[in-house]
Amino acid sequence: MELEPTLFGIIEALAPQLLSQSHLQTFVSDVVNLLRSSTKSATQLGPLIDFYKLQSLDSPETTIMWHKIEKFLDALFGIQNTDDMVKYLSVFQSLLPSNYRAKIVQKSSGLNMENLANHEHLLSPVRAPSIYTEASFENMDRFSERRSMVSSPNRYVPSSTYSSVTLRQLSNPYYVNTIPEEDILKYVSYTLLATTSALFPFDHEQIQIPSKIPNFESGLLHLIFEAGLLYQSLGYKVEKFRMLNISPMKKALIIEISEELQNYTAFVNNLVSSGTVVSLKSLYREIYENIIRLRIYCRFTEHLEELSGDTFLIELNIFKSHGDLTIRKIATNLFNSMISLYYEYLMNWLTKGLLRATYGEFFIAENTDTNGTDDDFIYHIPIEFNQERVPAFIPKELAYKIFMIGKSYIFLEKYCKEVQWTNEFSKKYHVLYQSNSYRGISTNFFEIINDQYSEIVNHTNQILNQKFHYRDVVFALKNILLMGKSDFMDALIEKANDILATPSDSLPNYKLTRVLQEAVQLSSLRHLMNSPRNSSVINGLDARVLDLGHGSVGWDVFTLDYILYPPLSLVLNVNRPFGRKEYLRIFNFLWRFKKNNYFYQKEMLKSNDIIRSFKKIRGYNPLIRDIINKLSRISILRTQFQQFNSKMESYYLNCIIEENFKEMTRKLQRTENKSQNQFDLIRLNNGTIELNGILTPKAEVLTKSSSSKPQKHAIEKTLNIDELESVHNTFLTNILSHKLFATNTSEISVGDYSGQPYPTSLVLLLNSVYEFVKVYCNLNDIGYEIFIKMNLNDHEASNGLLGKFNTNLKEIVSQYKNFKDRLYIFRADLKNDGDEELFLLSKSLR
């Protein structure tokens, strides 16, 4: 079949009488030349058609005809090969009405019942075949108008050919090689249960859909088979975690998923056996809800291996309030299955203080250091509270009470040896929690916890105070290690004077212990030793010798310590190993004042005796008068040093230690039962006495005014063991963080004038005080030797001693001037600090 004659016949059929035969022949020839040109382009067609439009009549009918011709030729220009053009024209020719086909000499081979089965030979090679199936309409040439011309009359009168062929007859050839829907339904049930089949084999968690399934059914299968893939994924997780040693909460989650998979299997089997599924559409409609449920279960188990059970519980608790009812229902079901196990964790901790088999799924955990020893546990209970892991359905404050209940139980049972009481306590609340188990974590559960917390904390305080004398020990620490009882320190120094003057490497420990006992008997602390009830309080007192190296004397290395044993060692931080050793640091600092004061008192008495001795010499001459005057004047300088030492000691003891101790005891008094006639009073600066805080109402008033239990309105707060330790640590921290004590970089206050931290400036001043008293001691010794020589009338020796006497006088004056200069700068630093207390201290140091 030739190109030009066929094209001529088709154009003549599309636009009869549009052009004369000669013009039409010329037009077709020009078009064929363009089609055969190697540089052909559809843009060349426009000018050619415009030229021949001028040769025809201008009317609406001719415009429509030219539009049809242009549209037809546009599709033809899209074909590259001449043979393909001829095939295209042949197909197009067969679609023309029969009365026009008679005019065309060539035989038609277009779209009809005969050639539809072999339509692949007519397809254009321009478009790639469909990825779905070869028998798809998607594979027909987009450059042609076959689909549009088949589906619409295109202004032509339908011929007998169209009326005799139905749409099914036209489409049946496309489905000859496809798989019927009935056969697909026979195999789908296997795939839904993640079982491979001949039609739909599984390949590494993928389902292979045959290419002979039409596009529509293939799309439905993509949706339906999601259930099979989800079922396979969940089944794999169930089998995997059944073989592992996982926590009970995760096991409960796996059991729930396993039951859901069993229900899904039964549903699929019933669906297949019922015969209600007649198409893929109906199958998808029936299984859609199960797909949604399996999706939700897969979402919840997405990170099952990495996350802990309590994390799942927290997440499920959030989804319990989800807007989607299906998600809410599934989350609630899973939450209820896991919360019972979490309730057991709580019960074991609340009634027995046990953390066994929690698998790290609890907000309370053991914190045992692998490098630690058994001795470390006498200072702390190795249990920690992780606030970040507290679930949202338990209030943070209540979670802390839960933590303290179990910790207090361990404290009483293991450290206080209250075995009988803890057993009765455990049985009592085990019954209460067991009876509340059907309610779960509810308001009633919270009320039981509040009552249990109050009971165990009150009993803990009672045991600490009555059995282990907690408050007595606190006051003993303040009176001894913080030098609250000055008579004890004076007696101790007086008794240990000779021992402290010996070298540190030869200090006998047994003598220090004996001196310590004698000092207690001579002081106001003797009631602690003489009372059988309080003897354990004073028994913890111990004398220690610091290791400062060779050349030190007892005064430099002596210190006091207090040895605590459980349970008090857990609530009172007294020089714990690897700690800051707060009491040791404070004692050693205050020891400087006591040491200086002792030597000044000693030298003052010695100087007074020397002066009185000189006055008794016969022949009271001007030389003796001069010596007496010089000693008296030096005594005035000594008094200024001594006053500075006493003022600073008083400030440390009264304004720093005593004030912080009062604050601590006010907090500790909350744990005691006060009578209604005892009030907490404070004295203002002007001497006025006022009530500290608000006067609390009587318990009877609260009972009559409300039907609630009086315990719910308790105003006084009882401190638990952690709070007792915290109060004591705060007391020590506040002392050491004071500007005159602080040594930490973040707490140090540097003087504006000296450029030194206040404690450093003060230590230098105290060293000056001590150096002064040493020179002053030498002066007194020389003065005493002069007195002896004068009594013996050894004037030559007296003259030599007078030279030494005057040299020491000059050194004393020099040290005094140096001290006054340092004191002036120190006072300026305090005055310029901006702190009112330090400003008043600077004024008192004038």
Swiss-Prot record:
The residues that cross the membrane are none
Q: Which Gene3D superfamilies match?
A: Gamma-tubulin complex, C-terminal domain
A Gene Ontology cellular component where this protein is annotated is:
gamma-tubulin complex
What is one GO biological process annotated to this record? microtubule nucleation
> Organism's domain of life?
Eukaryota
| Residues found modified as Phosphoserine | 124, 136
Q: Which InterPro entries match?
A: GCP (IPR007259), GCP_C (IPR040457), GCP_C_sf (IPR042241), GCP_N (IPR041470)
Q: What is its main location?
A: nucleus
Q: Where in the cell is it found?
A: Nucleus; Cytoplasm, Cytoskeleton, Microtubule organizing center, Spindle pole body
GO function terms (MF aspect): gamma-tubulin binding
Write the record's keywords in alphabetical order, separated by commas: Cytoplasm, Cytoskeleton, Microtubule, Nucleus, Phosphoprotein
Question: Does the record's keyword annotation contain Magnesium?
Answer: no
Q: What does this protein do?
A: Involved in microtubule organization by the microtubule organizing center, the spindle pole body (SPB). Probably part of the microtubule attachment site at the SPB.
Other information: Present with 56 molecules/cell in log phase SD medium.
* Subunit details: Interacts with TUB4, SPC72 and SPC97.
Give the protein family: Belongs to the TUBGCP family.
The protein depicted here goes by the name Spindle pole body component SPC98
Originating organism: Saccharomyces cerevisiae (strain ATCC 204508 / S288c) (Baker's yeast)
Biological classification of the source: Eukaryota, Fungi, Dikarya, Ascomycota, Saccharomycotina
